[in-house]
């Protein structure tokens, strides 16, 4: 395992999120026997390895909280959501939120610590890395810290408890503690708020993370923004106490990295605080802004986003869905969804993909549930993602250099504004991606960055659409650009290769 801990991540990893509890439940049904992390059939690990991922995020492996589960079952809104999702819902389907953690040990239902170690070995044998959760902002009401280390938490008073019982709770040791929250929404009823300014809590968080780092290759840090000094002060004001001279994340990440230098930190980030979290030590931060642009805006907004500094973009993780967002198939019509996938998969940064996304799943599953309803598979979507992942992997695009391209139009045709275009270069390999991010047919001239195009002719192979285009004259490509005409939500994903003139002459003869 020591050797595994030293394995580094690629510069722009592709990560696949799996709901561990639900996945093992479905495998148990499929194989008609109890499946835990230590006896997942090898063909299931093989199936993951074949798809071109660099890491697997097993979401929700930590010990669930009995108290949190009871709160879930007694909260009408949660129960109603579960009933809408599962027509045959029963209370046994509720597992409690994986983000209300009872303890950072793999849940016995999933196979415990030994099962998690077996899963990591199985993944490592297939050159896959393991990503797990870390929830820095709060713990479950029955987490041992609540009674053993009340000083780790934001404190309240009896007056607070009487005035606002939804935001405070009485611990069994008599302490009044705040429930977890962010500055914009009511408190989460199944959580207790940790105090990011507590020196004891920071030490305990670093120790917890080092134990986690001994068991996996990285963590996705839930609501990481809430631990920033400025955000925590705005949320809790005088209850937070004196503002420390150092930031929580700089302190905690630095301590972990001293022992585990290659350990990966991903931040769930919002509110345009991605750059700030990157400066505190995070390898990647959620690119929620790009997601919102793809959902609600057009090509111009997306293009503007992609003009950001490359050092910033390369430390974003891009996605169309995850367990917090609606399913992409329910958000994007099929054609738009494929166009959006082309954008996130062929731009810089890490990629986050979600179990069920490739099959066109439409039901957003509550994190409180341990099973999901069956859904029909969208065979066209599955084939699209299979081909896209294969091509990105085969062409090793994410190891190269990326450049945004201009796309020009004509006085009487400004549809070029709908086109997004960029290039990748890796040694002699060149790739061009063009996406029509609109519901109208669009045309334009893509200006290519390569200075040596004028020497000879060039073949274009659009592998995602299984088309090979006639060779283009290099002088024209160099001066005027590449003419592109795409249907609504259409795309090209093309390799550019210089034609061997002598070989072409021999074939013609």
Q: Where are the regions that the model predicts?
A:
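Active-site and adjacent substrate-binding regions of carbohydrate-active enzymes
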Residues: 2-509
């Amino acid at each position: 395992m020591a050797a595994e801990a030293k394995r580094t991540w690629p510069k722009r990893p592709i990560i696949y999120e799996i709901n561990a509890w639900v996945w093992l439940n479905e495998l148990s049904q499929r194989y008609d026997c109890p499946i835990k992390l230590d006896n997942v059939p090898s063909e299931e690990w093989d199936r993951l390895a074949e798809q071109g991922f660099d890491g697997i995020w097993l979401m929700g492996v930590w010990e669930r909280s009995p108290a949190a589960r009871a709160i879930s079952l007694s909260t009408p809104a949660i129960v109603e959501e579960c009933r809408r999702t599962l027509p045959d819902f029963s209370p046994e389907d509720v597992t409690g939120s994986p983000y209300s953690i009872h303890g950072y040990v793999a849940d016995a239902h999933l196979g415990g610590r030994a099962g998690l170690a077996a899963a990591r070995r199985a993944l490592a044998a297939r050159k896959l890395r393991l990503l797990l959760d870390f929830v820095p902002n709060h713990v479950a009401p029955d987490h041992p810290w609540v009674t053993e280390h009340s000083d780790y938490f934001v404190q309240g008073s009896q007056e607070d408890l009487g005035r606002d019982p939804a935001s405070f709770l009485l611990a069994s040791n008599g302490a009044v503690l705040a429930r977890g929250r962010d500055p914009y929404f009511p408190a989460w009823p199944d959580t207790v708020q940790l105090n990011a300014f507590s020196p004891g809590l920071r030490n305990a968080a670093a120790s917890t993370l080092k134990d986690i780092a001994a068991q996996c290759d990285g963590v996705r840090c839930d609501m990481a923004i809430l631990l920033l000094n400025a955000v925590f002060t705005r949320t809790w004001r005088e209850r937070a106490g004196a503002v420390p001279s150092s930031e929580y994340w700089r302190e905690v990440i630095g301590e972990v990295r001293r022992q585990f230098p290659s350990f990966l930190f991903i931040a769930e980030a919002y509110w345009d605080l991605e750059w700030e979290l990157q400066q505190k030590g995070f390898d990647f931060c959620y690119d929620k802004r790009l997601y919102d642009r793809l959902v609600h805006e057009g090509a111009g907004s997306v293009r503007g986003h992609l003009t950001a500094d490359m050092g910033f973009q390369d430390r974003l993780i891009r996605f169309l869905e995850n367990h917090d967002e609606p399913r992409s198939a329910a958000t994007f019509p099929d054609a738009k969804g494929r166009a959006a996938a082309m954008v996130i998969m062929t731009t810089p940064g890490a990629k986050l993909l979600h179990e069920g996304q490739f099959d066109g799943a439409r039901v957003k599953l509550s994190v409180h549930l341990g099973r999901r309803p069956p859904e029909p598979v969208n065979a066209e979507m599955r084939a699209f993602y299979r081909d896209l992942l294969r091509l990105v992997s085969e062409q090793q695009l994410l190891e190269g250099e990326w450049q945004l391209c201009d796309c020009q139009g004509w006085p009487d045709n400004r549809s070029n504004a709908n086109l997004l275009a960029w290039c990748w270069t890796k040694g002699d390999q060149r790739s061009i991606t063009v996406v029509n991010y609109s519901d109208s047919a669009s045309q334009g001239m893509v200006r290519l960055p390569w200075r040596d195009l004028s020497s000879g002719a060039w073949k274009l192979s659009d592998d995602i659409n299984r088309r090979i285009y006639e060779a283009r004259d290099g002088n024209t490509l160099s001066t005027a650009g590449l003419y592109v005409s795409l249907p609504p939500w259409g795309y090209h994903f093309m390799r550019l290769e210089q034609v061997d003139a002598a070989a072409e002459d021999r074939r013609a003869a």
